[in-house]
């Protein structure tokens, strides 16, 4: 007999075809990894830096309600936050805001904002942003912070540029102009244009914005920005150290690894469709490009834009 089922082992929800034969034997197809087979996943000790980095970036303890003297700020777990959340988590905590981060992406999150997506041609990571904002609004968050970031830090000296793609740069403008919920619920939606070009430039921009919007003394904002910049640097250092640990693990064990390159938000399980888990299920370690890029030397000039 043949029956259909759906695996619930990960966000892929693979459709399984189960063929049962006489004698109790069965053959399962449609699965992308071993989970759908009902077999205990082998080699759980294989490093997966997609998963490790995801938790390093987002596992920050927010202030308790009694210590949040300036209230709650909602931050969507989207796009540029996969590069800079350590900064914002620290910055707002230092200023006395309790950070409410939207949950891990899922199809349910996507469906929350589907009616406000202005174009089907947008990439899926951008479409998810609508759902994350909607989730925050439904939690009665009075203030949402989602800045426009045209420029990130320059990764290496000599890089051709350090700008974000247009969607990452200004998608919060799209949100502001297409989500009527923000106005209906009287949510303060703050999306200033800022740049991570340098610590000084970003700090100055933040001092101006938070003086204007919340009357926070510039000296206080400057101090918070300093701690936030240091935490962002520490997060990046931790990723590099973890990459070195995995390389040493590969040398010690004789195993193989794969550098799974992509944009920062590709560590989102809903976006990467579990490809990192699939790779580790075959016994390969998974490294992110930023966990090992500091170990190499780029021969210049390049024939592509390096940023």
Put a short name on every predicted segment.
Residues 1-307:
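An N-terminal assembly and electron-transfer interface module characteristic of large anaerobic redox
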């Amino acid at each position: 007999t043949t029956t259909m089922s759906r695996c619930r082992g990960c966000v892929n929800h693979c459709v399984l075809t189960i063929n049962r034969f006489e004698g109790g034997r069965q053959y399962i197809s449609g699965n992308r990894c071993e989970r759908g087979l009902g077999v205990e996943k082998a080699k759980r000790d294989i490093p997966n830096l997609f998963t490790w980095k995801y938790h390093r970036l987002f596992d920050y303890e927010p202030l308790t309600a009694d210590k949040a003297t300036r209230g709650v700020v909602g931050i969507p777990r989207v796009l540029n936050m996969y590069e800079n959340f350590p900064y914002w988590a620290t910055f707002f905590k230092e200023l006395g805001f309790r950070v409410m981060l939207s949950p891990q992406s899922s199809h349910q999150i996507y469906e929350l904002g589907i009616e406000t997506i202005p174009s089907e041609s947008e990439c899926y990571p951008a479409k998810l942003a609508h759902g994350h904002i909607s989730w925050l609004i439904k939690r009665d968050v009075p203030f949402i912070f989602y800045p426009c970031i045209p420029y990130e830090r320059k990764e290496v000296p000599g890089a051709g540029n350090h700008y974000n793609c247009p969607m990452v740069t200004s998608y919060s403008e799209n949100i502001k102009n297409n989500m009527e919920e923000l106005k209906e619920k009287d949510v303060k939606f703050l999306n200033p244009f800022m740049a991570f070009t340098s610590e000084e430039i970003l700090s100055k921009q933040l001092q101006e914005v938070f003086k204007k919007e919340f009357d926070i003394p510039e000296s206080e904002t400057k101090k918070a920005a300093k701690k936030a910049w240091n935490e962002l640097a520490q997060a990046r250092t931790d990723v590099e150290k973890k990459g070195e640990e995995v390389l040493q693990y590969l040398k010690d064990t004789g195993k193989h690894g794969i550098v799974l390159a992509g944009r920062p938000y590709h560590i989102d399980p809903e976006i990467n469709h579990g490809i990192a888990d699939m790779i580790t299920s075959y016994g390969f370690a998974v490294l992110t490009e930023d966990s090992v890029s500091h170990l190499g030397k780029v021969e210049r000039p390049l024939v592509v834009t390096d940023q």
